[in-house]
Amino acid sequence: METSVVLRSVRLSAQKGRLVVNQIRGLQVDQAIKLLTFSPKKGAVIILKLLESAVANAEHNEGADIDELKVARVFIGQGSSLKRVSPRAKGRGNRISKPTCNIFLTVCNR
């Protein structure tokens, strides 16, 4: 039994998100929640909400036991970038790219 969740267009760079995701891949859900709760990274808060949503979906839709769930697959893909212009001296402008990412997470029974 597997439950998948997807979060798209998150205002987080894929590179910074992968630092957090690589720590929880393959862990049991309760260990992953503890790790994400005490992580100082911005991506940890976003991924924690996504993980809790996946656990709630597995419990409600599939009737899964929370103690037996583990993070089966989790990966981050690069999303579209928001393009902005920053004013510079002498009437010029610089282009600023604000990256987004897509997070895919799957939990399953052991």
Swiss-Prot record:
One CC-aspect GO term: cytosolic large ribosomal subunit
GO biological process, one term: translation
Superkingdom of origin: Bacteria
Gene Ontology terms, MF aspect: rRNA binding; structural constituent of ribosome
PROSITE patterns membership: RIBOSOMAL_L22 (PS00464)
UniProt keywords, alphabetically: Ribonucleoprotein, Ribosomal protein, RNA-binding, rRNA-binding
Transmembrane regions listed in the UniProt entry: none
rRNA-binding among keywords: yes
Protein family per UniProt: Belongs to the universal ribosomal protein uL22 family.
Protein purpose: This protein binds specifically to 23S rRNA; its binding is stimulated by other ribosomal proteins, e.g. L4, L17, and L20. It is important during the early stages of 50S assembly. It makes multiple contacts with different domains of the 23S rRNA in the assembled 50S subunit and ribosome.
Subunit structure: Part of the 50S ribosomal subunit.
Name of protein: Large ribosomal subunit protein uL22
Upper lineage: Bacteria, Pseudomonadati, Pseudomonadota, Betaproteobacteria, Nitrosomonadales
